[in-house]
A protein has these predicted regions:
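Membrane-interfacial loop-to-transmembrane alpha-helix junctions, especially the N-terminal start
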Residues: 104-110, 151-158, 298-312, 357, ...
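Membrane-embedded helix bundles of polyisoprenyl
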Residues: 92-98, 106-195, 205-228
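Transmembrane alpha-helices and membrane-interface helical segments
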Residues: 94-101, 137-147, 187-192, 288-292, ...
């Protein structure tokens, strides 16, 4: 930041979307002068709600946003560092751990999948994609909750799942939440089925702790929505995004943007964030998944679910859904370009899933 342009040391300057730094940074910093209270008189020159304009409000609802805790605990300088660095570091660690789980504990595949997600152009240009960091972390916690050997481990994991669940729900952006929600739900189903023996061993008192944690999650979400009720009401009464209805179609081109994404650091474009994608070699992962399913005779539930979702998302991105189907599946809240983003994630999950199935057990 600053008021004087400084010439770069090396390379060429490119225009870049400014929302994530030139807009957000001043908003975060103004909250300090309100002591992170309910109202902010600085950002718009009049009374506005801090939680709506800055996302920072020191109350019970702040439990829904772990990346902001640094502001309340250590002040704005360290808080901003945490805000920028914590989600990215978390995504790196947890994406590798997530792929370690679905790759049958194959470390090479785990690192490969984790790097393809965490260091993808999609993550780099958007920076700190919240539904990825909290979603994948929640999946890891759920897996280890199911497969934990000791009660204390499940008691620690339960509130972690609750906070991550609250964070995911309070993203309040269904364009990402709906398609990613189907993916995450499918993975949870696979975790339960594949670990059914361990799932049945979960004790009653452990379920009670988990249930209490879910109530804890619900309380955070309710308070958060109450604190943001004015903002939510105003947004829902707008033409965009409040009244937007999507039925899909005509966005499959975006699935091939991974080719261009590689060159975005070297060639200026109008909106790198919108067009960036994970490098997936689409549609090859889907073709290989079909081959593997035929060869494995459909015995891998995760591969079946991920390929099924890939086919559904491909249909939505090409020809679209009838309006009634879009409404029933909640895809009416999902612009086709956003569905393509999640289709990209599926194209990373698929090759990790079928590659580990084709490797020797002890490889």
């Amino acid at each position: 930041l600053g008021d004087v342009y400084k010439r770069q040391v090396y390379g060429e300057t490119h225009s870049i979307r400014s929302d994530e730094w030139a807009v957000s940074t001043p908003r975060y910093l103004t909250a300090k002068y309100t002591d992170y209270g309910k109202y902010n008189y600085i950002i718009m020159g009049k009374q506005t709600e801090n939680i709506a304009q800055t996302g920072l409000y020191k109350s019970y609802s702040a439990l829904a946003k772990p990346q902001t805790w640094g502001y309340y605990l250590f002040g704005d300088s360290i808080g901003m560092s945490v805000e920028w660095c914590f989600p990215f570091i978390l995504l790196i660690v947890m994406s590798i751990q997530f792929f370690y789980i679905i790759a049958g504990k194959n470390k090479v595949l785990a690192v490969t999948g984790g790097v393809m997600v965490a260091f993808s152009g999609y993550e780099m240009w958007w920076m700190n994609v919240e539904y990825l960091s909290c979603g994948l972390t929640a999946l890891v916690c759920i897996y280890y909750f199911i497969n934990a050997e000791k009660t204390w481990q499940r008691m620690v994991l339960s509130p972690c799942i609750a906070i991550l669940g609250a964070e995911y729900i309070t993203i309040l952006y269904p364009a990402f939440q709906v398609p990613s929600g189907y993916v995450y739900f499918g993975i949870v189903v696979w975790m339960v089925v594949s670990s059914w023996d361990n799932f049945k061993k979960i004790k009653l008192k452990e379920w009670l702790v988990f249930a209490a944690s879910m109530l804890f999650m619900a309380s955070i979400v309710i308070v958060y929505l109450k604190d943001r009720s004015t903002y939510v009401t105003e947004i829902m009464n707008t033409i965009y995004p409040g009244s937007r209805v999507s039925t899909g179609g005509y966005s499959l081109y975006k699935m091939f943007e991974y080719v261009a994404t590689i060159f975005y650091p070297f060639k200026a474009t109008l909106n790198n964030s919108e067009f960036s994608m994970m490098v997936t070699l689409f549609p090859l992962p889907m073709v290989m998944a079909v081959y593997c399913i035929i060869k494995q005779k459909g015995k891998d539930i995760l591969l079946d679910i991920m390929l099924g979702l890939s086919c559904v998302y491909t249909i939505y991105c090409t020809v679209g859904f009838p309006l009634i189907v879009a409404r029933l599946t909640l895809f009416s809240y999902v612009p086709e370009e956003r569905a393509a983003d999640l289709l990209g994630l599926l194209q990373v999950i698929l090759p990790v899933s079928y590659t580990h199935l084709t490797l020797p057990t002890n490889s």
